[in-house]
């Protein structure tokens, strides 16, 4: 069996199979008996393949599970974060298998064992997290414990609820108070589980003037409670946060506890900051949670334990009500939910538990201290000494801001400044978060959208550090990546307005304001048949933009270009990505306009040529038919009779008629094929008009990519050479215009020798000057053209 397990590529599955085999060997008192089949059973076609025959061995089944987990080899690898399962993780996984085995014991042994496991785990959690004189309820879904607590509160406040049911609630409606910063969907979940209507929920807003904007407004909550009491409602339960789901801020739990005691409201606390109760130093706001009526803990996430249930600790003296509410159960299977946590806590010990929580807090503090030294990064910090969650975002520094602007609470910033910052930086922060997630996946970053602060990046090591194995070096790498992305972010933000002005000042281009695009901007080319009022798709415009995208990508610039429909309509647009500081926006916009115009003209030229060819063919058919009729009139009817016509043609041969017509694509005209048959050479036809030359492209240095500004003051090009280069270009332009004027005079019989001498002298002068400009390839090419 051990040799077979070594064939499995996934070490986690192999280790788990080995642990399960070892546990079964130790726990079983007698060797397992194998059942012999009495005869070969007939194979039914309705039975799936894996179930046919005598079954599969464990190695084959584990290999099948491994293939299902990692997918086929042909599929592209997905960038999914796989949790790092350590020894403590194997203990948690082993607990589920042991739970299934323990459930086969006799009832008395099972009762004693499950009672011991449940009581030990409850006592350990109460001592670790400073919650005295409480009971524990273990549940798989995090919100399930709160739903049971709400049911317990209903039974406690409504004594006749067991007899009269919801009629009691109808006469005096219960009210459950939730913070506006609570996790999404929590209120709807509670109403669905309890069978209560949505008006029983009361959403308490957060602070707007003083304190954190993610903390519950206590004064407003008290006003809501008084209003509900006056209306004949019953304030039932309040859910407070010790670490909100978004930014990890803690409510004023001490003040909320006093308010709940005054009105007889059940206080329930949840949040990631409850993990810090295991540390030696705890902030006063979090420490106040130990006096609440109930709290929900998630030790599996904090300690990196897979498939470990959440725990709800509560205080209540009536066992009958807790049994009715579902918080306690006589079923052994319900008590065995604590077995994985019971094994894992013993394996880690108190020092291991505290060390893991302390490590996560140190990671967050390390990131906070490093981000303070980074410009253009704002940190949403509640308590710098104890906050285990770091939320930050990129922002454009205001002119009147000082060095302490980044560390102050967001509520102290002017609302107008926050609005401008959010409007211009949300897309860039979303791009920054996605880039950091790819570059440093060990940090477990998430991108969040906050109602007040906009798009931010969250680092919560308490929820991810143990599973991903986050270290201090990963935080340092994260800071390095942030610093490397800041120049691109600041330059892109600065170039946005310049790009908008250039596009609005260029004929044929329309600036598209897309707030969700993080690049320089979005532009659309308006062709001749473009309808601005229509929001439907434009096939002609899509064709032009597709060709434009291909041309722009062929330039091999540092910019990224994408095509997609405008977010307000179905029309195609060109999306320009992030940029650095040396991007020439004017050249970029001019190139887009000229290239799109050329594509449109070429498309129309092809359409016109198709129409000309079609009309030419029709005209040729008409002329040939007319020529055939004239030939019949000249030859007469007798020549058309087979025998008679041959005799007449022998006595009086007819002259050869025209052979046909040819269509000159260059000239766009019909021509006779007589010249071709006589001279055996196809005629040149009419000389086509000269093709107009496009606009002269910007002169670039060797190796310089498109849309790059000239490097002034560099070693490659000095200021003197730049000035002389510009002067030489002007002389070449003057020379070309002078040559055109002299050529016109040369055709007149008045002064032909003088014009020729002038041209020769100017050419010779420029040729001598070009010998000192060996690196100026553009001048050499111009001189060769003039020569």
UniProtKB/Swiss-Prot annotation:
What EC numbers are recorded for this enzyme?
Answer: 4.1.1.-
Q: Which UniProt keywords apply?
A: Decarboxylase, Lyase, Phosphoprotein, Pyridoxal phosphate
Query: Where are the compositionally biased (Basic and acidic residues) regions?
Result: 26-44, 725-748, 772-787
Q: Give the region (Disordered) as residue ranges.
A: 26-52, 682-787
A Pfam family cross-referenced in the UniProt record is Pyridoxal_deC
Cofactor(s) needed by this chain: pyridoxal 5'-phosphate
Please verify whether the record's keywords include Transmembrane: no
One of the record's GO molecular function terms? carboxy-lyase activity
Residues recorded with modification Phosphothreonine: 687, 691
Biological process terms in GO annotation: carboxylic acid metabolic process
Q: Which residues carry this modification: Phosphoserine?
A: 652, 710, 718, 722, 748, 778
Record's compositionally biased regions (Polar residues)? 759-771
- PANTHER family from the UniProt entry: PTHR42735, PYRIDOXAL-DEPENDENT DECARBOXYLASE DOMAIN-CONTAINING PROTEIN 1-RELATED (PTHR42735:SF1)
What does the similarity note say?
Belongs to the group II decarboxylase family.
The name of this protein is Pyridoxal-dependent decarboxylase domain-containing protein 1
Name of the coding gene: Pdxdc1
């Amino acid at each position: 069996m051990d040799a077979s397990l070594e064939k499995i590529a996934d070490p986690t599955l192999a280790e788990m199979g080995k642990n399960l085999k070892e546990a079964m060997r130790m726990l079983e008192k007698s060797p397992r008996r194998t059942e012999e089949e009495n005869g070969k059973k007939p194979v039914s076609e309705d039975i799936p393949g894996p179930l046919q025959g005598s079954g599969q061995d464990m190695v084959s089944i584990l290999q099948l599970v491994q293939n299902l987990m990692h997918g086929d080899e042909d599929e592209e690898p997905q960038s999914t974060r796989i949790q790092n399962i350590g020894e403590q993780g194997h203990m948690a996984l082993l607990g589920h298998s042991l739970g299934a085995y323990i459930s086969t014991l006799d009832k008395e042994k099972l009762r004693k064992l499950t009672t011991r496991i449940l009581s030990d785990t409850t006592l350990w959690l109460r001592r670790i997290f400073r919650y005295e004189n409480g009971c524990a309820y273990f549940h798989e879904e995090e919100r399930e414990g709160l739903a049971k607590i709400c049911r317990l509160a209903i039974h406690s406040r409504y004594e006749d609820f067991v007899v009269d049911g919801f009629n009691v609630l109808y006469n005096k409606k219960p009210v459950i108070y939730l913070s506006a910063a609570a996790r999404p969907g929590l209120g709807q979940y509670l109403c669905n589980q309890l069978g209560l209507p949505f008006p029983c929920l009361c959403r308490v807003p957060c602070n707007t003037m003083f304190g954190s904007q993610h903390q519950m407004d206590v004064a407003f909550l008290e006003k809501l409670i008084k209003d509900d009491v006056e209306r004949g409602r019953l304030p039932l339960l309040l859910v407070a946060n010790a670490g909100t789901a978004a930014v990890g801020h803690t409510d004023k739990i001490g003040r909320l506890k006093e308010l709940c005691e005054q009105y007889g409201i059940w206080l329930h606390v949840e949040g990631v900051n409850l993990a810090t109760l295991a540390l030696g130093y705890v902030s006063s706001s979090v420490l106040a949670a130990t006096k609440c009526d109930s709290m929900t803990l998630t030790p599996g996430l904090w300690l990196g334990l897979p498939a470990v249930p959440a725990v709800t600790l509560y205080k209540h003296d009536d066992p009958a009500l807790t049994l009715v509410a579902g918080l306690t159960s006589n079923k052994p299977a319900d008590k065995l939910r604590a077995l994985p946590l019971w094994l894992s806590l013993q394996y880690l010990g108190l020092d291991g538990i505290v060390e893991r929580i302390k490590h996560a807090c140190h990671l967050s503090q390390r990131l906070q201290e490093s981000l303070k030294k980074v410009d253009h990064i704002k940190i949403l910090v509640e308590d710098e000494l104890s906050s285990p969650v770091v939320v930050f975002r990129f922002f454009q520094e205001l002119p009147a801001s000082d060095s302490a602007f980044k560390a102050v609470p967001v509520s102290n910033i002017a609302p107008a400044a926050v609005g401008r910052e959010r409007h211009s930086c949300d897309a860039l922060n979303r791009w920054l978060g996605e880039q950091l997630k790819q570059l440093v996946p060990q940090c477990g970053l998430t991108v969040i959208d906050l109602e007040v602060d906009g798009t931010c990046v969250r680092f919560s090591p308490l929820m991810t550090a143990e599973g991903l194995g986050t270290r201090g070096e990963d935080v340092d790498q994260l800071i390095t990546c942030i610093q490397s992305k800041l120049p691109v972010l600041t330059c892109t933000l600065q170039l946005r307005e310049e790009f908008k002005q250039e596009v609005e000042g260029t004929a044929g281009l329309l600036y598209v304001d897309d707030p969700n695009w993080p690049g320089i901007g979005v532009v659309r080319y308006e062709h001749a048949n473009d309808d601005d009022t229509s929001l439907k798709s434009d096939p002609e415009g899509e064709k032009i933009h597709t060709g434009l995208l291909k041309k722009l990508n062929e330039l091999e610039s540092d910019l990224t270009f994408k095509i997609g429909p405008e977010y307000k309509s179905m029309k195609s647009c060109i999306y320009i990505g992030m940029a650095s500081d040396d991007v020439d926006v004017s050249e970029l916009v001019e190139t887009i306009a000229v290239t799109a115009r050329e594509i449109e003209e070429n498309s129309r030229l092809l359409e016109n040529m198709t129409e000309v060819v079609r009309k030419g063919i029709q005209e040729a058919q008409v002329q040939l038919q007319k020529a055939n009729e004239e030939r019949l009139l000249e030859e007469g009817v007798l020549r058309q009779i087979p025998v008679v016509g041959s005799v007449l043609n022998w006595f009086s041969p007819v002259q050869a008629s025209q052979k046909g017509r040819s269509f000159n694509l260059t000239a766009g005209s019909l021509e006779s094929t007589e010249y071709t048959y006589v001279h055996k050479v196809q005629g040149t036809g009419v000389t086509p008009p000269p093709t107009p030359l496009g606009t002269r492209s910007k002169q670039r240095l060797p190796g310089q990519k498109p849309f790059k500004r000239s490097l002034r003051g560099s070693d490659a090009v000095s200021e003197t050479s730049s000035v002389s280069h510009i002067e030489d270009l002007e002389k070449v332009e003057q020379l070309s215009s002078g040559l055109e004027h002299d050529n016109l005079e040369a055709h007149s019989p008045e002064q032909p020798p003088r014009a020729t001498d002038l041209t020769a002298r100017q050419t010779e002068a420029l040729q001598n000057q070009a010998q000192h400009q060996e690196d100026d390839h553009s001048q050499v090419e111009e001189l060769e053209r003039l020569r």
